[in-house]
C-alpha cells in the first residue's frame, strides 16, 4: 500500500509545517517528500500547500485533502483490526488521550487489566487537556478521549459519563488524615495548599464554588502536574485536590477525604469519540472494559 505511505508524507508536512522536519521524522530524503507532494498536486490539478519562506502551509484544497488522508488512515487501521479479529488474533492498538488526573493511578490499572486478557494489544496514551483532546479527536490522532469536564461539541459522541466529586488529598501522616469522614473546605484553610493550575478542570470547579463564598483558599504552590503535587505532599503538611476517580485510599503514602460543603458542585468525566467514526474492533472491546471499570470506581467512591 505504497500510496498510503506517500499520503503519510503529506500528513507529516501538514503537521510539522516543514519538508525538512517531515523528512527527518519519516527517514527519507526531502526531495522524495517534495516529489510526492508535487505528484499529488499534479493529479489533483491544484496546490495543496503554500510554499512560504519559512515552511509549508495547507491551502483550502489542502485542508480538504488532509481530512481525506487522515480518514483513510483511520479506516485502514479499523479494517486491519477487523481482519485480525476474524483471524482470532485480537491484536492492534488503542489510542487514547486522557486528563492528567487519571494518569497516576486509575488508568494504569485499567490498561494492565485489559492487557491481561489481550496480550497482543498495544496502547498509545497521551495526557492532555480538553482543548488538545478535541484537536486529537478531530485530526484522527486518537480513537478515544477520557476527559474531565469535556466541552459540549456537536461532532462528539459521549459514550459514557461519570459524575465526579472533588476530594482533598494529603499525606497519610497529615493531621486531617486522622479525622474520620468528610471535610469542609474551611478545614483546609489552616494548612498550606498545593493546587492544580487554573487551566485544570478540578481547579476551575473549586474556583467557581469559592467565588460565591466569604472565604478564600490561597495556594502556596500551583502546578499543572499532579505527579508534582503528590510528590510535594511528602515534604510538607500540605493539602491538594483531586477528582474522586484519581483519589487514593489504598493504604499507600496518601489519603483522601470527600468535601461535604453544601451545594459543592460535581463535574463530569466523559469518554468520547468522534461522532460517526468507525473505530478499530479492539477499541470497542476496550470501551466495554473501561465502562465496567468506571462503574466499579463510581461504586467505590460513592459518586
Question: Which residues does each PLM region occupy?
Answer:
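Conserved amphipathic alpha-helical core elements
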Residues: 40-41, 114
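A late-sequence structural motif
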Residues: 106, 257-300
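Flexible hinge/capping segments at coil-to-helix
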Residues: 156-166, 170-193
Amino acid at each position: 500500500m505504497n500510496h498510503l505511505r506517500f499520503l503519510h508524507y503529506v500528513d507529516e508536512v501538514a503537521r510539522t509545517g516543514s519538508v525538512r522536519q517531515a523528512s527527518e521524522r519519516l527517514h527519507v530524503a526531502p526531495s522524495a517528500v517534495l516529489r510526492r507532494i508535487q505528484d499529488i498536486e499534479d493529479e489533483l490539478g491544484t496546490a495543496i500547500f503554500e510554499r512560504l519562506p519559512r515552511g509549508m502551509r495547507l491551502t483550502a484544497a489542502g485542508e480538504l485533502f488532509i481530512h481525506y488522508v487522515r480518514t483513510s488512515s483511520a479506516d485502514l487501521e479499523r479494517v486491519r483490526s477487523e481482519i485480525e479479529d476474524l483471524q482470532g488474533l485480537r491484536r492492534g492498538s488503542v489510542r487514547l488521550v486522557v486528563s492528567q488526573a487519571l494518569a497516576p493511578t486509575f488508568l494504569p490499572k485499567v490498561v494492565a487489566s485489559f492487557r491481561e486478557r489481550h496480550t497482543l494489544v498495544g496502547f498509545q496514551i497521551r495526557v492532555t487537556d480538553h482543548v488538545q483532546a478535541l484537536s486529537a479527536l478531530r485530526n484522527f490522532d486518537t480513537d478515544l478521549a477520557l476527559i474531565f469536564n469535556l466541552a459540549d461539541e456537536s461532532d462528539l459522541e459521549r459514550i459514557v459519563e461519570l459524575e465526579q466529586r472533588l476530594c482533598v488529598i494529603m499525606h497519610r501522616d497529615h493531621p486531617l488524615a486522622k479525622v474520620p469522614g468528610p471535610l469542609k473546605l474551611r478545614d483546609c484553610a489552616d494548612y498550606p495548599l498545593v493546587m492544580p493550575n487554573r487551566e485544570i478542570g478540578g481547579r476551575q470547579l473549586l474556583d467557581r464554588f469559592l467565588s460565591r463564598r466569604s472565604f478564600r483558599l490561597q495556594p502556596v504552590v500551583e502546578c499543572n502536574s499532579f505527579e508534582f503535587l503528590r510528590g510535594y505532599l511528602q515534604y510538607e503538611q500540605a493539602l491538594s485536590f483531586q477528582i474522586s476517580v484519581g483519589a487514593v485510599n489504598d493504604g499507600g503514602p496518601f489519603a483522601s477525604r470527600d468535601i461535604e460543603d453544601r451545594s459543592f458542585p460535581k463535574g463530569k468525566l466523559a469518554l468520547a469519540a468522534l461522532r460517526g467514526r468507525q473505530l478499530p474492533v479492539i477499541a470497542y472491546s476496550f470501551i466495554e472494559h473501561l465502562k465496567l471499570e468506571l462503574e466499579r470506581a463510581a461504586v467505590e467512591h460513592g459518586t
